[in-house]
Amino acid sequence: MSFLKQALMKELKIERDFEVYTTYKTGFDEFDYRNGFINPETKQQFTGLREGSYTMVIGPSGSGKTTFVLQTVVNMAKPFKGRTIIMHYDLEGATSPARIMTTTGVTEDWLTEHYIKKDNGVYAENFYNDIVAHAKLKKDNREDLLYESDLIDNGKPVMKYVPSFIILDSLALLMPEKNLDEEGTGSNISAAQAAKANSSIFKKLIPILGKCNINLIVVNHVNKAIQTSMYQPNQKQVNYMKQDESVPGGNTAIYLANNLIKLNAKAAFKDDDKYKLKGFPIECTIIKSRGNRAGQSFELLYTQEYGFNTPMSKFNMAKNAGVVEGTTYLTIPGYDKKFRNSEFIELYKDNKEFKLAFDNACKPLLESYLSGVGSGDQVKFAITDDEINDIINKDLPEEEKKSKK
């Protein structure tokens, strides 16, 4: 370390050269890797969403935004059973406990322990104040809310706040209370006033989120942009969006996001579709990423009843990339039996040998999506797959535990 660097760190009371971060898996493997990177020196892989970050998910009506966010947040929260919380500001009234249980697989008891929904009386001011109070509560109970991550800094494990999660659905409906008229209709609120309030709030929130490991995921809409000139097309609000697309709530809330994800529904599956799913594919585009290349698009498979089918989405990825070969009868490396499209889910769910072979076959493809150069932050998974499986299986009867080994 140079003399000047050492002196500055001492003078400015900087403890580390750079902060060390963990990441959390969303359960959407292709997204996690396309949003991740690998350190070319240490070969560490950094996938998923970074701790204490802010993500915005946008799309037109009916594109599965809320379901995507709920499945993502629950998947990130599950490893921290009994210690984390999901605070859901459902301004659109789009979610019910039954829908959450159906799409995420959690129980009513799990929701009771980890989930709070607020859908009335939410304004920009008290939304901000709630998050400030949330952060203060974590700071005041710091020792009870720390966990030992698998990050090592100067030979010692790094202690982290247990992650907590906030969902805002949606930014388009977040308005400042002080501008409401007496009747409460909000008729005198302009888009500019709302954008100004959001700008102030989000600028102040970002450091709070990072410091206390509060993970904010915001749902927003994609609207038709108003053409302002007869002679010149509109400038894109953000790269990789279309010129005729507009996202409400102000530009600051967009630019401050660590990740900006756009969902767009495609034509529904036909009854004779090869996957036998009742739903439709959804194009997921990473409009903005601070860990990987922006502009990447890929498909996720969505069903009306159960939300995003993550195993089938991974299977679709593998087929399109040639990892799975064949037409009627299919093969994968490491598994000597052929199978049909319609048999995949049951095999993946119930056949340990098949699941292992399929996941191993997909691994090189997923790793090829990682960016080769990261931000320089030291990042590593907060929890391993084996630890997740131990947590999931710990309450199973001994007979079931043995059968899963």
Regions found by a protein language model. Give the residues of each.
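C-terminal regions of RecA-like/P-loop NTPase motor modules
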Residues: 1-15, 268-405
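The Walker A/P-loop phosphate-binding site
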Residues: 1-110, 124-133
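Helical mechanochemical/support elements of P-loop NTPase systems and associated helical scaffolds
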Residues: 23, 27, 50-53, 65-68, ...
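Conserved, well-folded catalytic cores of nucleic-acid-processing
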Residues: 34-38, 60, 72-80, 102-107, ...
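Short hinge/gating elements
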Residues: 54-59, 183-192, 297-304, 345
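Conserved inter-motif catalytic segment of the P-loop NTP-binding fold
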Residues: 80-189
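A structural signal for short, well-ordered beta-strand segments and their strand-loop junctions
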Residues: 88, 167-168, 217-219, 262, ...
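Phosphate-binding/switch region of NTP-binding enzymes
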Residues: 191-321
